[in-house]
Amino acid sequence: MAETYLLDKLASVEQTYQELTRMLADPDIATNPDELQRVAKARSSLEETVDTYETWKRSQEDLKGARQIVKESGNDPEMREMAQLEVEELENAIGELEKRLTILLLPKDPNDEKNIMLEIRAGTGGDEASIWAGDLVRMYTRYAESQGWKVSLLSESLADMGGFKEAILEVKGDRVYSQLKFEAGVHRVQRVPVTEAGGRVHTSTATVAIMPEVDDVEVKIDPKDIEMSTARSGGAGGQNVNKVETAVDLFHKPTGIRIFCTEERSQLQNRERAMQILRAKLYDMMLQEQNDAISSNRRSQVGTGSRSEKIRTYNYKDNRVTDHRLGRNFDLNTALEGEIHTIIESCISQDQQERLAELAEATNN
């Protein structure tokens, strides 16, 4: 990693980190909770890079010392052998540190820290597609819970035979978008449906959208573009059931997006939820346009996030999940129980390798 531009970037990151550390000790910042949180978060985001860089610098000094010992131990073969062994170990360690540093210096996705709206829609396959959408809701809920994230159902359209025509979950926690963004796309299942008397294998699909949460500052919505009506909702029981119009049906005229919210107790809360979902959908549309422009210039396997991209097949007969972007198979039963961390980490790793290759190509040109 002798590239000057990388070393310059690391020195700049370290300088920024030190400045942020000084700011945390500033009494004016210490008495301003919002600013204190902002500075602490910015410093924390650089901590791993700086720690790894410090380890790299120490290892370089140790390597220099070990090489000097090799040079000076001419008449002491035992000392020379020990020093040579240390040189080899340090060179290997430095190589791994340099790989890690290069990944840490890759441009950050500004949405990685955000919470998400996770939308699952039944695709082709009729009733079986809705049942499959329900299975995916369960899979992602279990995975989120295993990560210590909070999951809430924001909107649902139940299917007659079970499952969902559509479901929208809110997932809150540490770096949720960074972990789940590569789950967007078409998920295909091959199995014998419970509704199939003849035992034939059917193929059905469901589409997953991963939408980072945004506030009203990031996405402006003109009130004139909104049509809103209310309806009676099942509510939470008691006198409220079917008597008060708490459900909200929101229609965004420019895009044709319609959102029906019933999960909250009051009409105001459901309206706020519907607007929250609409903002996420509009922001996601903007991201899709950006990604389409980027992916036309990029040989990306995992990073497109296209709604029409078939990313995975779940084959019940062979107890196998195939991720088509990775060209790898995984165990079906564990995946359906929410144990998809290995698949997710593999997607993240492949995306990093692709971006590193692009960086190397750009540097050489």
From Swiss-Prot:
One Pfam family name from the record? RF-1
Q: Which UniProt keywords apply?
A: Cytoplasm, Methylation, Protein biosynthesis
Q: What is the recorded post-translational modification? A: Methylated by PrmC. Methylation increases the termination efficiency of RF1.
Which positions carry the signal peptide feature in this UniProt record? Answer: none
Give residues where N5-methylglutamine occurs.
239
Q: Which SUPFAM superfamilies match?
A: Release factor
- What is a single molecular function from GO for this protein? translation release factor activity, codon specific
Question: Where is the protein localized?
Answer: Cytoplasm
CC per GO annotation? cytoplasm
Lineage, top-rank taxon, reads Bacteria
Q: What InterPro entries does UniProt report for this protein, alphabetically?
A: PCRF, Pep_chain_release_fac_I, Pep_chain_release_fac_I_sf, Prokaryotic/Mito_RF, RF-1
- Main location (coarse class): cytoplasm
**What is this protein's function?**
Peptide chain release factor 1 directs the termination of translation in response to the peptide chain termination codons UAG and UAA.
Q: Which family does it belong to?
A: Belongs to the prokaryotic/mitochondrial release factor family.
Q: What is this protein called?
A: Peptide chain release factor 1
Q: Which organism's genome codes for this protein?
A: Synechocystis sp. (strain ATCC 27184 / PCC 6803 / Kazusa)
